[in-house]
Amino acid sequence: MENQLIFVRVATLNDIKYASEICRETESSAIARGTGIAKRPVEAVAQKMRDGKAVIAVTAAGIWVGFAYLQAWEQGKYVSNSGLIVSPAFRNSGVAKAIKDRIFKMSRRMYPDAKIFSITSGAAIMKMNTQLGFEPVTYHDITQDESFWEGCKGCVNYDVLSGKKKCNCLCTAMLFDPAKIAQQLLSPARSPYFPMFLSEAN
């Protein structure tokens, strides 16, 4: 849909009315694309809104556009950015990136020292993650909290994950490590192609 004003903001109690639609679209999108997206209970989505840990996009007319949420694990050591979904009518409009950027900034603000991760099989999300500073990692590099992996049981590919003892699956794990980013910023920049050398005055 073109020429509609879209608001991307933190979800509130008033947005719980969209929870059922979000869950339905998440499930139907997984079926249509044949990808592994875990089913999410309506109440779980509603609770994220109550907790102020979700981002929603809606039009000025109140039409739901998109959604994503965050969750802390291991006492805030890790934070997942999950559940990114956009209504089919608004895809390819840039709203997914706007939601992704907002949930990432929320995560950094609420948990500044946490490692932020995302697991996805979608190329578009991988690209957005890379632009934000995420890097591909092994599953051992993200949270080992069993509660997180329990959430994968609603995915059609859970048997693959279980069979590989949660070492890998069809999704790619990507991680943003603030400590690593800070270290890179402190390190002197060096060209990967040319050695360092000093020039002498003639």
What residue spans do the PLM features occupy?
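Surface-exposed charge patches
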Residues: 21, 105, 127
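Hydrophobic adenine-recognition pocket in adenosine-nucleotide-binding enzymes
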Residues: 11, 84-86, 122
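Short amphipathic alpha-helix that is part of the acyltransferase structural core
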Residues: 1-42, 56-59, 183, 188, ...
